[in-house]
Each structure stands twice: as C-alpha cells, then as structure tokens.
Amino acid sequence: MQIKFLDKSRLSLRSLLFLFILIIPFKLFSQTEYETSLIKKAEELSLYKDDYWLLLCHYKKSITGYKSLLDDKNFFLAPDGKKNPKAELEATIHSFFNEKTEDVIHPTYKYSSRYKWLCNKLNIDKNQLPYDGDTEYAKIKEMLKVKSFYLVFPAAYMNSPVSMFGHLFFLIESENTPHLAGMSINYGAIATDPPSLIYAIKGIFGAYPGRYEILPYYKQITKYSYLDMRDTWEYKLNLSDDQNDTMLRHILEMSFTYTDYFFLDENCAYCILFPIEAARPDTKLTEERSLVVEPVQVIRKLKKHGLLGNAEYRPSMYSKMMHKKGFMNYSQKKFVKKLCLGKAEISNIPEGLSDEEKANLLEFASDYLIFLLSDKKISQKEYQKRFIEVLTARNKIKCEKSLAFEIPVPTSQPQNPHGSHMVSTGTGVDDGDFFTDAGFRLLAHNMMDRDDGYSPNSQIEFCTANLRYNVFEKKFSLRYADIVNIVSMPVYDSFIPKKGFLLRAGVAQNLCSDGNENLAFHLKGAAGISCFILKCTQAYFFIGADNFFSGKYNYNSDILAGGEIGFITTAGIWKQKISGSIYQSPFDIEHTRFEARAEERLSLHQHLSLNAFYSFSGDFRSTKHSAGCSLRLFY
C-alpha cells in the first residue's frame, strides 16, 4: 500500500480558504450584532425625537406628525424618510455599514453632519465600520482651510423683482488668503429663465429647485458690485472652530440635495439659517418663520443672538463712481464722458489739475468704461483700447492715492432695521368729520420709515390695510387694503441713468361723481426719475395711470392718467415729504383729481415713530381739507 503525501502549497491554500470561510461569517455576524446594538441604543435614547436630529434633516411639525423641508426624495435613506424621523435614523445607522464602492458616495461622507452627531451620541467605534467618511471630509476641509465664516449681504436692488429684499450668502475666510481670493457658499434658485416678472411669479410658487453652491467670492462680488451695482456688507460669524466644522459639514451634506425655492419664505435668508443653527442649536433660528423672510430681518435676528461681528462695508462700483464724481467739476465730467465714448483723446485731459485730481479723473474713467462694457454701450474691442490708454496714463502719475481714495461708510446699516411688521393708531379730521383709524402692515418698509437696511426713500410693502371710524357719521370704513405697494426711486445720473417706478394693487375707496365713495379694485402704475436737489433733499417725478374697477362705474372702470411730483427731505430722526399730483379722466372733463400733500415723520425709537399729514384735494369740482397724526409701532 502506497502512502500519498499532500503538496504543501495546496495544503496552505486549503487552510487559508478554510480559515477565510470561518472568519467572514464571524465578522459579518459581529458587524450585524454591533449595528443592531447601535440601533437599539438610539431607540433607547429616543434620538429620533431629539431636536438636533430633527434639525439636521430639516423636519418641521405638520398636521400628521413631521415633514422635512427637503424635497429630493432620493436624499432620504428610508422610503418614508421625508415624513418618518425614526425610520430615517435607523436607515442612516444601517447605511454606515455599507461597503465602499467606487461609483457611490459613502453615507459616512455624504451625511457627514449626521455621522459626526451619531458618532458622538452613540459613541460609535469607527474601527467597526467598513469605511470612515471623515477621511474624505478631511481632504475637503484641508482644501478650503476654513478659518471662519462671514455672512454677506448684497443690498436690495429695487429694479429687479427677485432682488428687492437683498440677498444673503456665506464667505469662507481661509488662512492667509484675502477675501476676494476666497470661496463663497451660495444658496439660491437654479433657474434658466432670465430675471423677469414671470421668473418672480414662478419663484413665488416654488417652481425652481434651491441648491448650495461653492463659488469663487470674486465672481459674486463682480455680479453684485459691478453688474447689479449693489453695496455689500460682510459680518463675521462668532463661532468656535468646532462650530465652524459643524457648519461646514451641514453645508456639504445639504449640497447633495435640494429644496423647492420659494422667493418669499423658503428663500436664501431662511435656508442659510439651518447651517448656523446646526452650529449653534441653542439659538433655534429656524423655528420662527413668517410669511416672508427678509434678509435684513435675518441679520437683525442674528445680531440679537450675538452671532454677528461688526459690519465691514464693501462699496459697489456705483458708490465708488459717485464718490469720485463728487471731486470733479463740470468740465472734467464732460471730458471723461467724451473720452470713454471715443469722442476725445486722453492727451486732451483738462489742464491745471493736480496729480491727485488727474488720478481721480482717470480712476473714474476706468470704472465708467467697465460700466459701458457691461451695459453693452461699447464693444469689447473699444473697451480694451480705451481701458489700456487710461491705465497707462494713470500709471504715469506718481501719487498712490487719489482724492476719493477713502469712501465713507454709510450711516444707515443693514443690522439696524426697523421691524418689518407695523401696526398704527391715529386720529384726524377729514372734510370736517373727525375720525380715528387703525393700520396694519404685514411687511416690509414705507418710504417715510427709517431707511436702515433698505434702499433710501424706497418703498416695498405687502398686505397693508387701514380701517377708519368717522365720528359724526358713526360709520366704519375700510380705506384701503393693498396687496403690494412698491416705489423705486434710484437717483438719476447722467453717467448711469436709472429710472424709477411705482406699482400699487389692492382695493381702495374711490370718489364717484355723485359725491359718495365706494370700495373698488385699485391698480396704479407709473414710471419716472429722481435726483438730489440738495444734499438731504431728493426730488422725484412720476407719470402714469391710476385705475379703479367696480360694477358701479361706466364700463366697470374709472381710468385716470396723470403724474406726481414730490420732494423728500431727511435730517436725522426727522423726515418730510411734500408732494403734488393731478390725474385726469379721458372720458369726463370734470373728473380731474388733484392733491397737495405734506407728510412728516419723527422717529422716536428704532421701532416707533410719530407721523402726521395734511392734504388739500379735489375732484368733480369739489375740494376738501384733511389732516391727522398717527403712532406707528414696528415689530
């Protein structure tokens, strides 16, 4: 009988295979057991009810329980994760034990803010996991080199329907990197439609997805400062290093999903609060949400919680140009315009100017050339030729600073706005009859209010109403109820001409030919210009139509065409508006409506003002005097 000996190499392979078969089930069993223990521990701690878990997934209470504001169904790990915090928590823990594959982002990285929180809460042993997403997160963190976050506020841009309230986004301050060379984090609507009324309407109803994007900061400044000509304000967020880390994790996690973007409430101003609240959960910033979330009110809220440092002002190209223009006389301005439009040679620069004056003139010219190019008034070829000529001439001047080097910081700053909501009570006399009234405004700003945080002498009001009681007649009447009342009065300038407009829509009392008033649908629109005639007095002129619609009128309408002229003077806590208007019906020669009106405002406090008015008006060959005063409370 022959004894056969086994080959040693074959014996070794069989032994390894045997050991592998024994070890793998044990490892899988060990993982499953650990995974089960974590889920059990999370349930014992009721983590799915924890306020922080609800915050991380953007859950808000609904009629049936909870519902996340995140609208991307693929972002949730549980099939019913959008409405089931418990199922989403369990699915999240399960996902941490998924094997790493090349074509799928591992959940420990994709959900890095959840990962950090659950590791701390459950004391997760990362060695028991197939993959640690913090390895990838550390690379992103090293690339961005986050030192701190800044909140950036480009001021309101009244001539764009979607920018009337301004905007908010984040700036990442990196080590040894100037702000303009840094990165920004923007949350906004992803839309292919150009800014327009249709764009605004679709945005109101959430027709666009909203996403976080990481963009170079200089591109943001180019857009807001040079193209839109909006001043920007930077506020450093008062957060620790660990809080900055938490905030960055949440932003990265949210970059994998989207929400339906609503211009009025679920907008940039509201959605950027989630990363800040993730860093500072004690603030509960997202719990209160009004029908409209305004950037200036968010700044006010963050300031109240001590989250914002001092404001850093970054003037727009428009502000820089207007400041430089203030140091130029008429002949210098005329020369610059001709030079930039190719009607004058740079060698013909006005004589007798100091080096500082020449430097200021040439710096203004370089800015104006940029504006002309962006406004498509000159071609790229014309711009390059003239811009190089201007820069060459400027470099020949030895002085480093021009006359307008220092640009003063505006006294009106966004962090100190009045409350957006307003209630008022007042009394007065109207055509010999005493009255008392009460007013309400849902939001935001009247041109007679303090300007802090809003465009000076502008107006943007939503849902305002005034109820009056006439003492002699013993009758209540709704004087008006406006859905929207907007007045834009940018200052007209010969270099950068801007046009104003007004729009008012709602219901209002309207005088009929029989001498009685009736409530009718009201639509008023006009266009015009505005300019400063004194340092503190702004004049304006509008021309347009004032229309009323009711079944009591011939052809169901009362159409008036005409115009209005006015002067607004601001001096500290006092503001005055004097105006006159005249409108004529094209169908009735006796239907000529005119009014001369004076309004005064004394600001008693940031959120309290005393207002008064006097009016002399007439229509259908009848005239009347009215006067009154009111106390307005903003909150």
Residue ranges of model-derived segments:
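N-terminal accessory segments that precede or flank the first globular/catalytic domain
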Residues: 31-204, 351-488, 507, 526, ...
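Active-site nucleophile-His-acid catalytic modules used for acyl/amide transfer and hydrolysis
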Residues: 217-293, 547-550, 614, 619
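Transmembrane beta-strands of outer-membrane beta-barrel proteins
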Residues: 421-425, 438, 463-465, 497-505, ...
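Solvent-exposed loop/turn segments connecting transmembrane beta-strands
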Residues: 427-437, 469-478, 509-521, 535, ...
